[in-house]
């Protein structure tokens, strides 16, 4: 019997996949970087995807909600992948190095010190309307602060990412919003410009803070 191929339309738009309960429970007892979840299980998620469609030119984004596990990275609330035209434009920066700076993520330093990121991310909002969508996710109690990442998305047109950090503890805070491009990157007028022919990507900083480009060491032919 032959079946006609059909696109999985239920994966188009905004989709949040649930975090398996054993993964949640293992955070506090696992062998590596034990951290008790600080968000109720019902508010967690595993992955959050934004998919415009199944054509090659359609854009796709994947955000991580889980920052532990066996082969783990501290990438909760980080954008793992952004692709358009069938090509990756934002990606993980390292296979081995797992700290937030190697991801499209937020680094929070308080009084000159860093802490391990929380294990799970809270899903506050994930809504798809007729022509646009909105998501809101929060990493709670991250080195004395809550970090909320809001994304406003018009499929195949633009993506607005707003990061808000709310201090819960008094201290001297330093914030680094990191982006990990795939391709030839440059900085102009506080914007990250990426060329990965035939695609181009502009990550524009609308708040005016200065930007800089750092070249990290190569590992396994990763840029």
Residue ranges and their predicted role:
Residues 218-223:
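Short, intrinsically disordered, charge-balanced linker/junction segments flanking boundaries
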Residues 3-215:
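Catalytic and substrate-binding regions of extracellular carbohydrate-active enzymes
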